Amino acid sequence: MFSLAACSNTQQNDASDSVSSEAPSQVAESTPAEGTETEGSNILIAYFTYGENAELSDDVDASSSASIQIFNGEVTGNTGVMAHMIAEASGGELFSIRTVEPYPNNYNDTVDVGETEKNNGIHPELATHIENLDQYDTIFVGFPNWWYGMPMVMYSFFDEYDFSGKTVIPFCTSGGSAFSDAVDEIKNMEPDATILDGLHIGSSSVTDAESRVSEWVQGLGLSK
């Protein structure tokens, strides 16, 4: 079961995709290769979320930003909540993607940093690293949609790891732009990985998405 502190300001998203309209849950147009077998996989859920990468105080008010969530007493973000739901449904292990340089605690400043990173092709340095990638054959990869695509830290992540022969399953949160070009970008960076159907959930719907996430994981054949 989940313990969440929901947020009241729905005008802000997990950082920003520069879209204020809310979109329903959406499955990306990527399909498994014929004969793909995922049952019994060793599963990792790697995710980047604003709330775990910002300079926030321990007593941060989650209601001050729709990008911040309190999950089981810990500060996270919308994508982090979704990652925990996937872990609960699949029995997979969680891996939080962290940057060396934290993002600002001010929402608008973070939006500006994200835009600067994208416009200048900056790949932020990673502070956390997967030490035992070989033991996993299925990797859920989650992120918010920032500026109509993946945050640039995700390019750092895919630069660092070769997922050849593994199954990669994207998931994301946003205010309305869903995956944008993220799935195509992942396919380009990991041409020898199998990319399965991804799930997008609107930022304001994340805290109520446990059943939707569980059904999706079950549909992939990855329920614990």
Predicted stretch roles:
Residues 3-6:
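C-terminal motif of bacterial Sec signal peptides marking the signal peptidase cleavage site
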Residues 8, 23-136, 148, 218-224:
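N-terminal beta1-alpha1-beta2 submodule of the flavodoxin-like/Rossmannoid cofactor-binding fold
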Residues 44-46, 94-96, 138-142, 169-172, ...:
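Structural recognition of the beta-strand scaffold that forms the well-ordered cores
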Residues 50-53, 99-104, 145-149, 174-179, ...:
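Solvent-exposed loop/turn segments at secondary-structure junctions
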Residues 67-76, 141-144, 170-175, 200-204:
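Second-shell loop/turn segments in exported
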Residues 80-84, 88, 152, 184, ...:
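Solvent-exposed, polar/charged alpha-helical surfaces in well-ordered, non-transmembrane soluble domains
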Residues 107-191:
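Helix-loop-strand module that forms the ligand-binding subsite of alpha/beta enzymes
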Residues 194-224:
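Glycine-rich phosphate/pyrophosphate-binding loop and the adjoining helix
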